[in-house]
Amino acid sequence: MVKIVIPKEIKEVLDKILENGFEAYLVGGAVRDYMLHRRSNDFDIATNALPADIIKIFGPSYKTIQYGCYNMRIGSYNVDITTYRKEEAYEGRNPSKITYTNNLLLDAERRDFTINAFYMNRNEEIIDLYDGQKDIKRKMIRAIGNPTTRVREDPLRILR
């Protein structure tokens, strides 16, 4: 089996955030794909840096920052950098209110499924708060929190 490595360009993004005194983790589907030895061109980074801090580090984004998410392209890679946050009730597919937090555990609570809630640091060490690795081995998709609520928040989650 071929070992997939995190692209150098993505590690450089993590390094810039870390060098500025903030936490930075790859999170979500890219980490899941990494564990399954699949390549990804989409990378999500979770950090305790606020959107204004991210703009200071990387400059203005070509997209408007919404919900604490900063988007950038590096070659063929799409990178979303999102501030740790808590979300309140949804209006359509988006939360009615978000609150930034310094707490990775609170950020993890808003994730949809256990197999998308992995956090991986720059050294490729994985934090698995919800036993997602077991779910991957069992080929099981399990919601974090109430499954009905998770699907109602964003019905497209079922398709992704």
Language-model segments: residues:
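Catalytic cores of the polymerase beta-like nucleotidyltransferase superfamily
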Residues: 1-160
